[in-house]
Amino acid sequence: MSKPMYVKFEVPEELAEKAYEALEIARDTGRIRKGTNETTKAVEREEAVLVLIAEDVDPEEVVAHLPELCDEKGIPYVYVPSKDELGAAAGIDVAAASACIIDPGDAKDLVDEIIEKVEELRE
């Protein structure tokens, strides 16, 4: 299956798993936003430290604006394969097209590592 049009770079599975883990840790020890509306607001306000975007969102237009907005605001983002897993990592019982970390809490080192790897992928 080809990637959706909003996916601008390939994320290795190992990195996506770390992103889910960072979101879970930040959920418990820091602050997160879940869902595209909350994520978009956090990016616009430049509160987000890292944005997670699911690759299996339908229709794509739900999250298609996020990569461009993140680039405009200088906020790193990472793609994860599953909106269901993203919702679970965010602590909700439904799928989440996107989520973001506002305060990484105990996940700070992990978030820094993810951001560094994403920057390498985008070079």
Curated annotation (Swiss-Prot):
Gene3D superfamilies named in the record: 3.30.1330.30
GO MF annotations, alphabetized: ribonuclease P activity; rRNA binding; structural constituent of ribosome
Primary location group: cytoplasm
Entry keyword annotation includes Ribosomal protein: yes
GO-annotated biological processes: ribosome biogenesis; translation; tRNA 5'-leader removal
Alphabetic keyword roster: Cytoplasm, Ribonucleoprotein, Ribosomal protein, RNA-binding, rRNA-binding, tRNA processing
Cellular component aspect of the GO annotation: cytoplasm; ribonucleoprotein complex; ribosome
Record localization: Cytoplasm
Quaternary context: Part of the 50S ribosomal subunit. Probably part of the RNase P complex.
Function summary: Multifunctional RNA-binding protein that recognizes the K-turn motif in ribosomal RNA, the RNA component of RNase P, box H/ACA, box C/D and box C'/D' sRNAs.
NCBIfam families: eL8_ribo
Family of this protein: Belongs to the eukaryotic ribosomal protein eL8 family.
Name of this protein: Large ribosomal subunit protein eL8
UniProt organism field: Methanopyrus kandleri (strain AV19 / DSM 6324 / JCM 9639 / NBRC 100938)
